[in-house]
Curated annotation (Swiss-Prot):
Plays an important role in the elongation step of protein synthesis. GO terms for molecular function: protein kinase activator activity; ribonucleoprotein complex binding; structural constituent of ribosome. GO terms for cellular component: cytosolic large ribosomal subunit. This is Large ribosomal subunit protein P1. HAMAP family: Ribosomal_L12_arch. The lineage of its organism: Eukaryota, Amoebozoa, Evosea, Eumycetozoa, Dictyostelia.
Length: 113
């Protein structure tokens, strides 16, 4: 794992720890946790994640994360594979409708004839 990803994850986990304990998520508190864990990160990460995590309802996010992830992927694949036959069926239906309209015109049964 790259150093940047490790730093990002460390800040995210720090934010989750603070939230779990009911403590307000701030850059200083994230820095304190990281120092206690002997993890060094770029100086901009704690402030960035503190501002980002302060805007998010973390418990709700965690509850909804598992419910839509895997289930959302399967229907997309199924819909994509089903879309091609459905499109072909629509084209065939339109062609048949056009032929029916033409046959009505040939019989002289138009409304304004």
């Amino acid at each position: 794992m790259s150093e940047i990803k490790t730093e990002e994850l460390a800040c995210i986990y720090s934010g989750l720890l603070l939230q779990d304990d009911g403590i307000e998520i701030t850059a200083d508190k994230i820095k304190t946790l990281l120092e206690a864990a002997n993890i060094t990160v770029a100086s901009h990460w704690p402030g960035l994640y503190a501002r980002s995590l302060a805007k998010v309802n973390i418990p709700e996010l965690l509850l909804n994360a598992g419910s839509s992830g895997a289930a959302g992927a399967a229907p997309v694949a199924a819909a994509t594979s089903a879309a091609a036959p459905a499109a072909a069926a629509k084209k065939e239906t339109k062609k048949e409708e056009v032929k029916k309209e033409e046959s009505d015109d040939d019989m002289g049964m138009g409304l304004f004839d």
